[in-house]
């Protein structure tokens, strides 16, 4: 896979990480949840969810697992080359 980077508000993300962010937003929409609902379920602020989805806050593996569990998606859903619905 070609290694490209994207800039968003001072952050630099690889194409792979940008893909993860897109899938994170998609999974939330598929689950029919708002950012406020997700934040409440995770015990976080809505700004946490927004920053994660925009790439302003780097996701760690534990956070990704929590999102995946809430959205009823396998971790592979969020990773390039493993597209599953």
Task: Please annotate each region the language model reported.
Residues 24, 35, 46, 61-64:
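Helix-turn-helix DNA-binding elements, focusing on the entry/boundary residues of the two helices
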Residues 22-41:
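Short basic helix-loop element that most often maps to the first helix and adjoining turn
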Residues 31, 42, 52, 70-71:
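Core residues of bacterial helix-turn-helix
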Residues 42-59:
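Recognition helix of helix-turn-helix/homeodomain-like DNA-binding domains
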């Amino acid at each position: 896979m070609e290694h490209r980077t994207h800039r968003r508000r001072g952050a630099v993300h690889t194409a792979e990480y940008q893909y993860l962010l897109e899938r994170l937003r998609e999974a939330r929409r598929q689950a029919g949840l708002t950012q406020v609902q997700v934040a409440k379920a995770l015990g976080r602020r809505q700004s946490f969810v927004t920053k994660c989805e925009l790439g302003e806050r780097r996701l760690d593996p534990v956070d990704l697992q929590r999102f995946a569990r809430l959205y009823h998606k396998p971790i592979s859903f969020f990773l390039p080359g493993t597209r599953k619905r």
